[in-house]
Amino acid sequence: MASYATLLEKTRVPQPSIQRFAVISVFSKLRSAPEQFGSEAEAGREAISFCLTSESITVVDQSVHELCRLVSDSVLDLSRGLLELQSALEGCDSKLVSLFVKGLGFLIRIGYERNNGNWKFNSTENHPFVRIQSSRVETQTELLHQVSLFVMHNRRLGMVGVCEFLEPFLNFTILRIPLSDSSSSLFARELISSMASLCCSSRHEALPIFRLLMRCLKYIPGNNLEVIVKILVDAYTVVVRDLVGTGLEVTEVHLLGVQLVDGVLFLCASPHVQTTEQESVIESLKHLLAVQKDLGLAYSHDLSLVVLSLVFMLAKSTVEHEQLCILKFLLFLLKWKTESENLSVKDAAGSSVESLLLFPITALMSSPSKSIKVAASKVLSIVENFLVTVSNAPKIEVHTSKGDSPLSRVGSVVFRFMQQLWHQNDYTPSTSSFLRVAYTNGSEKQETYLGPVTWNSLLREHAERFWDKKKLSASFCLSQEIPILLGAVAGVMVMHPSLGADAIGSLTIIGGIDSKMSVPLLLAVLYFSNLLSRTNVPCQSLLSKLLGLLPSLAAQQVMIPLVVQTITPMLRKDAKGLLYATAIRLLCQTWVVNDRAFSSLQEVLRPQGFIEYISERHICISMAASIHDVCKRHPDRGVDLILSVQACIESQNCPVRALGFQSLSHLCEADVIDFYTAWDVIKKHAQHIKLDPLLAYSVCHLLKWGAMDAEAYPEDAENVLNILWEIGSSMQKPHDSQWTKARVSAIVALGQYEVSFMENKFSDFNKNCTYLLFSETNAEILNALEDLSIKIMIHEHSVRRRYVREKKVPGSKIEKLLDVIPQVIFPAGKEIKTGELPGAALLCLSYNPRDVKFGSSRSFHDVHFQYEEAFRVVVKSLQLSRNISLALISLQSLKAFMRRWMRANILSIDATTKELSSDKTSKATNNIMKSLVHMAEEALPRCAENIALALGALCAALPAASHNIKASASKFLLSWLLEHEHEHRQWTAGISLGLISSSLHVTDHKQKFQNISGLLEVLCSSKSTLVKGACGVGLGFSCQDLLTRTEASASSDIDSDSYRNQEERLLGRIVRLLSSILHGFLHTPCDILESLSALFPPGEEDNVIGLPQLLDESSDDFDDDTWGIAGLIIGLGMSVGAIYRAGKKDAVVKIKNLIVSWIPYADSLKQTSGSNSKVSVRLFSVGSCLALPIVITFCQKVELFDAHEVDDIIGCFKDLISELLIVRKSGALRKRLLMASCIGAGDLLGSVLNEGIHPVKIESVKELLELFKKCYSGLYPPVAHFGGMLGVVNVLGAGAGNLVYSHPRPRAPPASSEENEISYVSGPLLSNAYFTQQLTPVVQEIFLIAQNTKDRQLQHYAAWAISILRTYMRSGESSSLSNENQSDDSDRNSISHNVPEHTMVMKLAQGLTNPSFPLAGSPLNIGTMASALRCLSHAPRLPNLDWGATIRRLMKQETQTDVTQSGDVPKEITLREECFKFSLAHASEFDELLAFLDELSELSRFKALEESLQSCLLCHLGGLMRIFSGSRMNKLFDDVSCFVVSLSSDQTYSCDQKSSLRVSCWKGLSQCLEETSLESSEYVTKIEKCIELLFAVLPVASQSPRADQMGSVKEWSEAVTCLQKSHRDWLYKFLQVSNLEPGNEKTNFQGDLKKIQAKAKLAKLGSVPFSELGKLKAIILNCEESDIWDVLIEIVAALHHAEGGIKRQWLIDAVEISCVSSHPSTAIIFVGLLSSICCEYMPFLNLDRSTVLSDMSVTVTSLLSDPSYEVVTEPFISFLWTSLERVYSFATESDANARLSSQQIAQSERDKAPMLVKVMHYICVAFRDHLPLEKQLRLASMDMS
């Protein structure tokens, strides 16, 4: 600095000229000095600083000039110059401030020029103008001048660039206002005024400056907005006048003015803006538009947004002069619009935002200000035209332009919502609404909302919730504008052609939301009444509905006079009749709302009115209806009108009389009038009620109240009952709805009287009621009769006699004969050896240890020895004759013998030791097993055959859990089966081995597979036809246990799928081999056998050795061929059950048809390829006769057998047996065929009769019995005699030789049964009184033959046959191995179900069980039968009838085409479903019903049911759980699991049917969870497994309002209900979600989404705490929004019902997560969703992905302005700002930079980022006061263009 010292010293000289020269010299030296002494050197810098910091103004002034010259000449760097001047400015004296500001201004202009108008700064604080302003307050005056100079000097470079340069400075100036003193505010105003002045001076370059100022408006504090707007408007006025005058930029300046008005109103009409005086702002904006209009500019459609903002401001305003100002503005806009010459009808409709003004303007008509009323009326007259235009052009799609801003405003949201409501009938909505989400998604009222939901219903729910909150917190209230805006929407919708009525209902709801709306609503009613009365309005029909709104307004006490005053003019005597009648009804409804109106109503309803207006039908009816309402709602008030009631009853007008009777009925119901006293007075007016259905209905409604005092007035009560019965039973009346209603009323009235009283007054009351029910076809009447019948049944049960338990006495001669058979055949005193009657001995001999003493083991050995010796004798003498039929009968007999042997052993062990039941059974069975094996080792061939059968019988009689015994027996029999050299061992061992396989335990897979594999091996390899046939029978037995269990039955070491696959492969081998072998024996083509083989493709293990040549009939071995083929056919027939379970129903039908075709003389019934061969028929006929009953029995159970087939097949058997009996030609085949046909015919007929499905002709039964009698009494071989006897026994149900199906013991026929002439019989013959008498001689004859010792062989067969029948009849008494806890079921049935004949239960039961019951009529229709079943389902007890057969017949009956169907029966109610429900109700009492349910719920049978019955069964899983055993329930749950899994891929069901079935399954599982306790862990595990499988196929819940989503809604509803009842620990574990990764194969993304949705729904219902849902926040909000949209909605719906603290925490957490999430849009959208559903504007918001973000400008700002959310506003805005910076950086940087700097934001967010930034920026600006200034400046610096 030394080199400059001299010159610097001269600056101190107090001489200005010397000082200036010194400064010039210093800077000249700096300019020319070498580098070490230049301006950049330390000496140079010090010299400059010295000059600038001088106290002399002259020095400083010259120094600033010289410094600027250095910079201008590029000697000094610009930044250095700015720095020097800025530093000097900050430390200078205030009088020097202007010098430095001028210098800085000059340098700034130079810098801008050098950068060609593109001078940018990295932060607002570094902006030179900002630095100047920030330095000190004194700079403001000169700074304004420099800014103006800057603009004027640099405008040549482009005004747009100049404005961009100044924008940060302008924003800084505005943002500093709230943080500094008033001078900042003043400076800001002056700055804006200065720039506005520049616009005036540079009119052609003014538009960019205007846009700059408009962009800054959003940062201006509200109290400064008024002045700023006035400045801008004034400047705009100058500019627009000039530009329009010159014709330049007219369009741009026009649009700019509209944008200015819109932008200012957008700020004023924002939800977060507090209500302030905005009158001057509105006036300024109006002035701007007035200038445009004066200049001839056209009305812009963009002004529709201005109107929307004014609508909101008008609704929100409470200040009169502000309201008046807005009205004037609106009036100006509307006039301008209507004056536009180019406004067409379509344009008016397209811009019909004005229609929203209707209700707010109408509301202002109640203002006390005359000026407001005048202005409002003017606006209303113009709006009316728009409204009429819209109503006449409803299909013109309405839309509004949103201009440049995509952000929503309250007005646009309301208008958009109104548009969608208006067009919802013309366009399918693609969006839902938040109201729907809040109140119909999993709420307690969800069932109500399944299907289309109207805004009206949702708004009503919203209003109810509002009042609930109001009750909890008195301070809770809605903003003033909400009900007004709701009214604005409803007011427009009133004019809708089809939705007007709903809109009027909405107005009623709005009145309930805010009591202050009553007067506006009254005015709206008056206005619309006037409007709708005009001819040019197409909605005149709504007038009455609109007037109906008046009474609802009377809820407010102050409104009563106004409402009554409004109605009163319509009650003038000169008023029109219809108007007068309407007024009466309105007055009545007003009284309903408020009792203060009663005096006015009573005056109108005086009795004289009926005389005065006798010719005015409408008025009389209106008066009567009002009297009726009063009596119904307030009986005490009704007493005051009793004379008017009497006047109604005395009227000649039937409707008036009817209403009078109904009014009196309500008074009697309330007991304010005595019924019989009143009846004495008015009964003369009820004499002709049968002429008018309405009158009959009303009188019956009255007469039911006579029940209370009927005993006190018996004569009058009897007359009343006669009237009711006459009307209720009058079936001759026309079948119209009115008479139906009358009859129902009469029957319901009868139900009010005591049953005992009616029985005393009516003879045969029960019989008449039953006849009426069975004769009726109308569904409504049937329902009423059901209730009456149920009441009668309950009464009968309550007064029933207590029957004394008596010793059971055989009820018929047949039973007496059967009881004495053992004593007669094996008398104690005679030496009749067991060996002579071996068959009977097996069934009759019994040795009981009568002398057993405790601790004695001798008795056990004695009894065991007795049985062993008897068995030795039997096996030696019982000849099977290589006859498979005899073998099966012997096996059946041996099973009964083994059961008695075991029981005797167990009883003996009981007396000697105290062991467990299972141990006793095992010990007893081991002893028998040892004896049998010991005997078998050295047995002769005949004995060996029987011993092999005995082993099978022993195992079949054992419990399934006896593993060891069955395994040992199987091993022993397998060894015999594989001894090909011992044929006598092989064939019976094969049969027994199959029988054992069918009775193995569920876990004995290995043993079962070994047994079947052995049978298949021998079937393929044996050269003996008999052995092949026996193996076929054994395989048929084995099939009974194939595919009967699902995966839950698989053991732990065998995979469930592989286990079932093994069984399916085994079944395939069995059917394929049997079909192939039969086809080989047939030697002729057979399409069915070939198709059966094709259904089960061959495997590598099948290798059938060449079939032996069939021998001639005369050959000795011909029997082997006959019975061998018969065995194969029987085996094939036995396999139908397994084939059906495998899902091959068609194969079952083919087998049935094939076997039928092999019966001789059956060709006319079924034609099958290959059946014409005589050889085939002869050889295959024996087996087909024996196999057919098995196949038909199964087909009956699964409904594959039609009624018309019964008579045809029975006819075939009759023809066959008749021919065999007539032709006495001897021959082995005829002998065997005669035996087989008799056995088969008897078994078939017995099966059909016992099932009870198909009635059989009486003559057919008689003819068959006669043929059987001829067979066993004629000169035929003994085996033929045996066949005839077995035919008789089988007809009675014994099922001789049929080990697959057994029939329940027949019930004794009713003691008082009448012998009526009948042509058909259904049910067991021994349960039929007629046939019991017919059969007694037949049984006696066989009984006598069994006593005849002349022919030992015939005696043997007769004794055996009669013993089989005896065993069958005693089957209920000996079904258990031990007598522990054994109850006598027969006694229970005969006593506990002993129901008198005259009772209602018995009459109904007879009508259903007996098709020929006289009361039933002919024929019964489905509706009648279903009603009878419903009645009996409620019966406390049922008579002891054959209910199993009845239910099966009814199940089949509905599917028959000849059954009449009542047209009134609802389609969703089916007879088959009622059969199921009836069975479920009484299955615990009747085993046959339990068996029916067991069959129906078998998986294969269940799959074949119709969808409605499947749904019914699934819905009642809980009921089945109450009656099924534990093991059966396990299997049922496994079957349900399999069905659920297979349902998804089943193509036979439609999507709706699948959904319906899943819904039913959810309902059923819910029932099961209710029935299941915590201790039932096994059931719970099974149920939870079903729930998991159902949940896996549950569709992801969607909020789409489409109709195809209704199934999903129902599924979710039931699923959530079910999950609510599940155990908490399992539920939390099941719904646990660790992460969400779409596309990751290791995770089930869709399943996880459903779990989250389920958890949200459960949280909404309170079943799961919100803390559980909160654990998933981070996981959910870090996913892409498109993947989890529905999940977000579900969570928001749940949070809507949460406490406020939970909502606020979710709001904060969501926006915080957006700061780090890779998908920030998801979190922000969630914030938008949550804000939408929680804010006040929720009723107007649509749930649409495209609008949720844009609506956040309304929803979030509204929510954060709520006082309850103010506590979280600051942290929310802080996190939102952080997220905004992150997303803004991502959106504005290049892809490469964004990947590095934006913290892992996914690239998929790039398209959403601009909108995200815009929304977040708006919210941050709106709540900028919660941010520090530096963040506000960065906020303002963000480029939002």
Curated annotation (Swiss-Prot):
Disruption phenotype: Shrunken non viable seeds due to arrested embryo development when homozygous. Alteration in cuticular waxes with elevated amounts of cutin monomers in leaves. Susceptibility to the obligate biotrophic fungus E.cichoracearum and increased resistance to the necrotrophic fungi B.cinerea and A.brassicicola. Expressed in the vasculature of leaves, petioles and hypocotyls, anthers of mature flowers and siliques. Expressed at low levels in roots and stems. Its main location: membrane. One of its GO terms (biological process) is alkane biosynthetic process. Keywords: Cell membrane, Cytoplasm, Lipid metabolism, Membrane, Plant defense, Transmembrane, Transmembrane helix. The chain crosses the membrane at residues 250-270, 296-316, 347-367, 479-499, 513-533, 546-566, 943-963, 982-1002, 1123-1143, 1175-1195, 1229-1249, 1277-1297, 1719-1739. Residues 1374-1393 are annotated as: Disordered. It is a multi-pass membrane protein. InterPro entries: ARM-type_fold, FOCAD/RST1_DUF3730, Focadhesin/RST1. It is found in: Cell membrane; Cytoplasm, Cytosol. One of its GO terms (cellular component) is cytosol. Pfam families: DUF3730. Involved in cuticular wax formation. Required for the synthesis of alkanes from wax precursors. May play a role in acyl-CoA reduction to aldehydes. Is repressed by FREE1 and functions downstream of FREE1 to negatively regulate multivesicular body (MVB) biogenesis and vacuolar transport. Together with CER16/RIPR, acts as a cofactor of the cytoplasmic exosome and connects the cytosolic RNA exosome to the SKI complex. Acts as a post-transcriptional gene silencing (PTGS) suppressor. Interacts with CER16/RIPR. This is Protein RST1. It comes from Arabidopsis thaliana (Mouse-ear cress). The gene is RST1.
